[in-house]
Amino acid sequence: MILLKLYLTLAAILCQSRGTTSLDLDDLMTTNPEIQNEIINKHNDLRRTVDPPAKNMLKMSWDNIIAESAKRAALRCNQNEHTPVSGRTIGGVVCGENYFMSSNPRTWSFGIQSWFDERNYFKFGFGPTRAGVMVGHYTQVVWYKSYKMGCAINLCPNEPLKYFLVCQYCPGGNVVGRKYEPYAIGEPCAACPNNCDNGLCTNPCEHSNQYINCPDLTKQ
């Protein structure tokens, strides 16, 4: 099995938050089904709004095994390095990873939106529109082939940005050679007319790293 080579996405950093918040760590734990739904719904809502539109964007769903992997990553409190590939390979599939850190607790929707907002500095097919900006979180959030994910949060008291949020995405995005084309441009669901949910495809290829005829498999 040939593993996809991935570029690691850089970590999104939120400096000292303005104002106060009533959130605490327990409010953000991803063992809570309501938090899981918030995370998945936020991703799917954003994936539906990409511009230019995507014809092959898959619908995301929650996966508890991936969430456990994200939890292990969060518990490391290593905000400077992403999890080694061996630590985020699940079922033979290499998964992508996004980090978000903040000094005060923020909602998952806030962190996910911050990743997506990197699109303001991204041009499809070209990449970053200015030097020194991060776009890898955005391209992972909207990577068309990623369809399963899990997230976790940890409190890292020895870090200035102590609230550490981690999401992992399978299969991972930011594949070498096409990371600035995270999806195929076209009318929403044009690639999956019989398997569509409000602009997102619902026919993932679970054999993506094993078979070269995956496009045919997903039509069945």
Swiss-Prot record:
<dbReference type="InterPro" id="IPR018244">
    <property type="entry name" value="Allrgn_V5/Tpx1_CS"/>
</dbReference>
<comment type="similarity">
    <text>Belongs to the CRISP family.</text>
</comment>
<keyword id="KW-0964">Secreted</keyword>
<keyword id="KW-0872">Ion channel impairing toxin</keyword>
<comment type="function">
    <text>Blocks ryanodine receptors, and potassium channels.</text>
</comment>
<dbReference type="InterPro" id="IPR034117">
    <property type="entry name" value="SCP_CRISP"/>
</dbReference>
<dbReference type="GO" id="GO:0005246">
    <property type="term" value="F:calcium channel regulator activity"/>
</dbReference>
<dbReference type="InterPro" id="IPR014044">
    <property type="entry name" value="CAP_dom"/>
</dbReference>
<feature type="disulfide bond">
    <location>
        <begin position="151"/>
        <end position="167"/>
    </location>
</feature>
<feature type="disulfide bond">
    <location>
        <begin position="77"/>
        <end position="156"/>
    </location>
</feature>
<dbReference type="InterPro" id="IPR001283">
    <property type="entry name" value="CRISP-related"/>
</dbReference>
<keyword id="KW-0528">Neurotoxin</keyword>
<keyword id="KW-0108">Calcium channel impairing toxin</keyword>
<dbReference type="Pfam" id="PF08562">
    <property type="entry name" value="Crisp"/>
</dbReference>
<keyword id="KW-1015">Disulfide bond</keyword>
<dbReference type="GO" id="GO:0005576">
    <property type="term" value="C:extracellular region"/>
</dbReference>
<dbReference type="InterPro" id="IPR003582">
    <property type="entry name" value="ShKT_dom"/>
</dbReference>
<feature type="domain" description="ShKT">
    <location>
        <begin position="205"/>
        <end position="220"/>
    </location>
</feature>
<feature type="disulfide bond">
    <location>
        <begin position="192"/>
        <end position="201"/>
    </location>
</feature>
<feature type="disulfide bond">
    <location>
        <begin position="95"/>
        <end position="170"/>
    </location>
</feature>
<dbReference type="GO" id="GO:0015459">
    <property type="term" value="F:potassium channel regulator activity"/>
</dbReference>
<feature type="disulfide bond">
    <location>
        <begin position="189"/>
        <end position="196"/>
    </location>
</feature>
<protein>
    <recommendedName>
        <fullName>Cysteine-rich venom protein VAR5</fullName>
    </recommendedName>
</protein>
<feature type="signal peptide">
    <location>
        <begin position="1"/>
        <end position="22"/>
    </location>
</feature>
<dbReference type="InterPro" id="IPR035940">
    <property type="entry name" value="CAP_sf"/>
</dbReference>
<keyword id="KW-0732">Signal</keyword>
<dbReference type="GO" id="GO:0090729">
    <property type="term" value="F:toxin activity"/>
</dbReference>
<dbReference type="Pfam" id="PF00188">
    <property type="entry name" value="CAP"/>
</dbReference>
<dbReference type="InterPro" id="IPR013871">
    <property type="entry name" value="Cysteine_rich_secretory"/>
</dbReference>
<keyword id="KW-0632">Potassium channel impairing toxin</keyword>
<feature type="domain" description="SCP">
    <location>
        <begin position="41"/>
        <end position="169"/>
    </location>
</feature>
<keyword id="KW-0800">Toxin</keyword>
